[in-house]
């Protein structure tokens, strides 16, 4: 598929690719290895965006001709495919086919996103209290948090639908314009931000459930040294490309997200030293207080350092000096060639269909 990115999405793709490039650069003290890592990440992301576009467009409404070339989102696709297949092999697990619409039908009002948001918000507020007495003393605040969570669950899907309605004419016009130049290409994809689809009810429910679970796991997991705080805001971006694989199944999405975050916490812990080194160098060069990490602490980022792309590309580039880069080059070229062959076959098939 011919792949184009809007300006915001291109910036997000470059930013995340630059993140891994910067970590490799500061770790190896070699800017060429940094460029290499960033370029490899960029290539793999664009190819995967093309390959996942059909499933993405089929699952989400009004997303025809749209793809998501965002490294963090795409990095969980292989992970989700493997775990989803393993879950399908568990006897009786297929009966737990619960999606947002199924929850509404089965539980009525209690399955509505608004109600779920209130319950989850009140639950999180209650868990933040040290005793039952503190819970009783803070009932107004707990209920307030529940109402805010309910509002988030209800309003975000509506807001994102407005964005989709506004971007749809732009997307269609761009596709028509490019189609005139590439007349034989019928698989044009416009790269957009995953923010367009984070308002899906399953994404909201699973993300909100995983926030307290992730904090709890960060405290009890042996060997983990990372406590996510600001990074929790990026939790929603874990699921845009997982949902097309699980068909929006809440249980499957939660399990995949849980496993991904457990592994991701260890990924972030392993890269924290290099992340901190990069942040200190930036602070010394710019004096920017936002990147100043206090002495005795290390920094990390759950919303990209926890991904398979970041961890894999870093270690194959930095830890395995010769073999690793060769593997990455072979992987990127192999994926690009396979994608090109797939595109050519699809175009030929579509061309023959139109002739008939």
For the regions a protein language model found, what residue spans apply to each?
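Single conserved hydrophobic/aromatic residue that forms the stacking wall/gate
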Residues: 1-14
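Membrane-interface helix-loop-helix junctions at boundaries between adjacent transmembrane segments
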Residues: 15-78, 91-112, 137
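Alpha-helical transmembrane segments and their helix-start/interface "positive-inside/aromatic belt" motifs
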Residues: 30-39, 111-114, 141-149, 248-260
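Juxtamembrane inter-helical linkers in multi-pass membrane proteins
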Residues: 56-100, 165-193, 282-288, 352-356
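Transmembrane alpha-helical segments and their short flanking loops
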Residues: 60-66, 133-140, 177-185, 224-356
């Amino acid at each position: 598929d011919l792949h184009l990115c809007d300006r915001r999405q291109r910036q997000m793709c470059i930013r995340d690719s630059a993140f891994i490039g910067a970590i490799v650069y500061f770790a190896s003290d070699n800017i060429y290895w940094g460029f290499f890592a960033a370029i490899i990440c960029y290539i793999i992301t664009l190819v995967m965006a093309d390959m996942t576009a059909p499933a993405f467009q089929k699952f989400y409404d009004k997303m025809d001709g749209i793809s998501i070339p965002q490294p963090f989102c795409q990095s969980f696709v292989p992970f989700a495919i493997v775990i989803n297949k393993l879950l399908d092999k568990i006897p009786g697990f297929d009966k737990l086919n619960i999606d947002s619409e199924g929850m509404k039908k089965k539980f009525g009002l209690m399955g509505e996103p608004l109600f779920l948001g209130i319950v989850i918000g009140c639950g999180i507020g209650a868990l933040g209290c040290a005793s039952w007495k503190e819970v009783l003393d803070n009932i107004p605040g707990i209920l307030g948090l529940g109402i805010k969570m309910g509002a988030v669950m209800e309003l975000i899907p509506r807001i994102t639908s407005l964005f989709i309605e506004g971007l749809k004419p732009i997307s269609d016009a761009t596709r028509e314009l490019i189609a005139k130049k590439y007349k034989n290409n019928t698989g044009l994809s416009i790269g957009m931000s995953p923010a367009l689809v984070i308002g899906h009810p399953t994404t909201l429910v699973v993300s909100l459930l995983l926030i307290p679970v992730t904090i709890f796991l960060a405290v009890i997991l042996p060997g983990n040294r990372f406590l996510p705080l600001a990074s929790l805001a990026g939790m929603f971006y874990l699921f845009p490309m997982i949902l097309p694989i699980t068909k929006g199944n809440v249980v499957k999405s939660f399990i995949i997200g849980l496993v991904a975050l457990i592994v991701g916490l260890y990924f972030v812990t392993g890269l924290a030293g290099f992340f901190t080194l990069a942040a200190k160098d930036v602070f010394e060069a710019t004096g920017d207080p936002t990147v100043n990490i206090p002495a005795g602490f290390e920094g990390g980022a759950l919303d990209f350092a926890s991904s398979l792309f970041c961890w894999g590309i870093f270690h194959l580039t930095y830890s395995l000096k010769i073999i690793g880069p060769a593997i990455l080059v072979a992987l990127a070229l192999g994926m690009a060639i396979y994608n090109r062959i797939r595109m050519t076959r699809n175009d030929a098939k579509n061309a023959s269909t139109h002739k008939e």
